[in-house]
């Protein structure tokens, strides 16, 4: 459930505060309330340091608060959800999402990975401001190494199907307690 401590599925998960590590729940991970500061280790991810090493390094990361007490957007910590999915199902996050969400909802354009994104001729590019204007950039491949945080691509039609399910209109896919 949402309130299950992730240490029950990932005993290797540690934060700098061991007791805090034992209290981090699935809900904390999904709501970016693990206790870490914003974007912990994103620069290392951008530098192509492998996700498993970054997840292990969370044990040394400074904490901004105790778990559940503050919000700090995460890519590395959020991606622990993929490890939890694998521990529970024995299957990869991307496959579980494809079979349990994309397919039943009819999200035919939804994909995982940068290659799938760039193979499509019609997609919104990320932009950065260079001090004078907004400039389009190519997505950083390294973020696609953490599919739970940054690996999904979806068009507006697929997003409408997803929103409809979140609003409770597809309880065959997303139950009411979600």
Model features per residue range: what roles?
Residues 2-17, 105:
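Short, glycine/proline-biased beta-turn/loop segments that scaffold the active-site neighborhood
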């Amino acid at each position: 459930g949402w309130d299950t401590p992730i240490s029950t599925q990932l005993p290797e998960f540690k934060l700098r505060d061991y007791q805090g590590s034992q209290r981090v729940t699935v809900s904390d991970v999904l709501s970016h309330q693990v206790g870490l500061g914003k974007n912990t280790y994103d620069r290392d991810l951008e530098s192509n340091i492998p996700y498993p090493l970054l997840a292990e390094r969370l044990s040394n990361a400074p904490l901004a608060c105790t778990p559940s007490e503050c919000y700090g957007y995460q890519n590395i910590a959020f991606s622990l959800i993929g490890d939890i999915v694998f521990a529970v199902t024995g299957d990869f996050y991307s496959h579980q999402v494809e079979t349990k969400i994309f397919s039943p909802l009819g999200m035919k354009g939804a994909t995982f990975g940068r290659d799938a994104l760039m193979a499509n001729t019609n997609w919104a590019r990320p932009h950065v401001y260079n001090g004078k204007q907004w400039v389009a950039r190519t997505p950083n491949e390294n973020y696609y190494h953490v599919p739970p945080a940054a690996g999904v691509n979806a068009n507006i039609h697929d997003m409408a199907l997803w929103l409809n399910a979140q609003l409770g209109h597809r309880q065959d896919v997303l139950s009411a307690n979600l």
